[in-house]
């Protein structure tokens, strides 16, 4: 039966080699198929012209290459591209952000999120399930094929990956790590560890595991230097406080690919954007001796949120203070907000997740969505 077949899409190189050995075939055949899937975008075994007829027949009997369907894709006026992808009746979003000299793909790891950060629209959906490794890597496969100019063969339009979409990737460690392995494999997408960034709200034990098993670039959603406030807006802080988090970050910076940690800081008016917050942040990072870059993210309002985006003056003042104290600081530009693709808007209209697919089809005028 179809559901009993192994989906080769989500297998990293070692796993696909193990599968081929299990069906009595050679490792080099596995590498051929792996390259066809990810480098060339081919998912039909019969189109893999360097495979023998008997092998193709066996693969059709034992395996499949299943790509989730795209419910819709839409480009923003600023060039940002968004895909809504059907994953077993639910939907996740993937966003491509073009910039001069690079193209960044923001990838989701869960349907919804377990952490319920108070300012995050995705968390308001609740949590459905983890994505499989195939569903994670499918987002890159789809983007690479859509954006490619070489008739399906990956041409590195996507130069950077950020695991910053829907969900907390370290809460789906077992599926996210193999997917990132594929992203970095030279037979697939060939991205370096420096070009793949995982963003976490602070699942501290898994940060150590990530360093040992993957070593991609790390970004941490800090949002405040104050434990009391962080307990409120990032509830996982009650389990792993700022001291524990920064201890893990310090080790990661020493051994990771960038020798620093990027700290993400969502600025919310009169919540964490005061000069006193900036002073406390500087004191914290200097006292813990964590090499840091700081990425300030002006809050993107969504229906029902009590939080507000700070004025440009307040954002500038916060940034200037950090820079004056020696920290490389950037302000994330709002991109794709006309298609609900900006950071923090990945929950669309913040409605029940079970209706997301129907809502988006309705937006496109599909009468079958009702």
Curated annotation (Swiss-Prot):
CDD domains: Radical_SAM (cd01335). Keywords: 4Fe-4S, Cytoplasm, Disulfide bond, Iron, Iron-sulfur, Metal-binding, Methyltransferase, rRNA processing, S-adenosyl-L-methionine, Transferase, tRNA processing. Residues 99-337 form the Radical SAM core domain. Disulfide bonds join 106-343. It is found in: Cytoplasm. Binds 1 [4Fe-4S] cluster. The cluster is coordinated with 3 cysteines and an exchangeable S-adenosyl-L-methionine. GO terms for molecular function: 4 iron, 4 sulfur cluster binding; metal ion binding; rRNA (adenine(2503)-C2-)-methyltransferase activity; rRNA binding; tRNA (adenine(37)-C2)-methyltransferase activity; tRNA binding. Its EC number is 2.1.1.192. It is an enzyme of class 2 (transferase). Its cofactor is [4Fe-4S] cluster. The active site is at residues 93, 343. [4Fe-4S] cluster binds at residues 113, 117, 120. S-adenosyl-L-methionine binds at residues 167-168, 199, 221-223, 300. The keyword Aminoacyl-tRNA synthetase does not apply. One of its GO terms (cellular component) is cytoplasm. The keyword Methyltransferase applies. InterPro entries: Aldolase_TIM, Elp3/MiaA/NifB-like_rSAM, Methyltransferase_A, RlmN_N, RNA_MTrfase_RlmN, rRNA_lsu_MTrfase_RlmN/Cfr, rSAM. PANTHER family: 23S RRNA METHYLTRANSFERASE, RADICAL SAM CORE DOMAIN-CONTAINING PROTEIN. Reaction proceeds by a ping-pong mechanism involving intermediate methylation of a conserved cysteine residue. Belongs to the radical SAM superfamily. RlmN family. Specifically methylates position 2 of adenine 2503 in 23S rRNA and position 2 of adenine 37 in tRNAs. m2A2503 modification seems to play a crucial role in the proofreading step occurring at the peptidyl transferase center and thus would serve to optimize ribosomal fidelity. This is Dual-specificity RNA methyltransferase RlmN. It comes from Francisella tularensis subsp. holarctica (strain LVS). The gene is rlmN.
């Amino acid at each position: 039966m179809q559901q009993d077949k192994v989906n080769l899409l989500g297998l990293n190189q070692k796993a696909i080699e193990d599968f081929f050995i299990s069906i009595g075939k050679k490792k080099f055949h596995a590498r051929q198929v792996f390259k066809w899937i990810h480098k060339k975008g081919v998912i039909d075994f019969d189109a893999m012209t360097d495979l023998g007829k008997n092998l193709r027949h066996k693969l059709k009997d034992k395996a499949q290459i299943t790509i989730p369907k795209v419910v819709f894709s839409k480009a923003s006026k600023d060039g940002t591209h968004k895909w809504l992808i059907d994953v077993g009746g639910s939907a996740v979003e993937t966003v491509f952000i073009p910039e001069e000299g690079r193209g960044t793909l923001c990838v989701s790891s869960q349907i919804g999120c377990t952490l319920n950060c108070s300012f995050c629209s995705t968390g308001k959906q609740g949590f459905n399930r983890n994505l499989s490794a195939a569903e994670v890597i499918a987002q890159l496969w789809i983007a690479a094929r859509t954006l490619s100019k070489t008739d399906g063969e990956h041409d590195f339009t996507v130069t950077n990956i950020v695991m910053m979409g829907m969900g907390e990737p370290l809460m789906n460690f077992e599926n996210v790590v193999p997917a990132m392995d594929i992203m970095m494999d030279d037979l697939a997408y060939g991205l370096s560890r420096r070009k793949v960034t995982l963003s976490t709200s602070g699942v501290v034990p898994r940060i150590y595991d990530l360093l040992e098993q993957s070593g991609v670039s790390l970004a941490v959603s800090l949002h405040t230097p104050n434990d009391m406030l962080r307990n409120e807006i990032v509830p996982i802080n009650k389990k792993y406080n700022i001291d524990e988090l920064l201890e893990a970050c310090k080790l990661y910076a020493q051994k990771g690919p960038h020798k620093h940690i990027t700290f993400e800081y969502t600025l919310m008016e009169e919540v964490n954007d005061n000069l006193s917050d900036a002073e406390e942040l500087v004191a914290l990072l200097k006292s813990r001796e964590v090499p840091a870059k700081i990425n300030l993210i002006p809050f993107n309002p969504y229906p029902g949120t009590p939080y507000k985006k700070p004025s440009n003056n307040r954002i500038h003042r916060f940034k200037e203070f950090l820079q004056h104290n020696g920290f490389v600081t950037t302000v994330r530009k709002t991109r794709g907000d006309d298609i609900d693709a900006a950071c923090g808007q990945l929950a669309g209209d913040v409605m029940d997740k079970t209706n997301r697919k129907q809502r988006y089809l309705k937006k496109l005028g599909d009468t079958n969505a009702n």
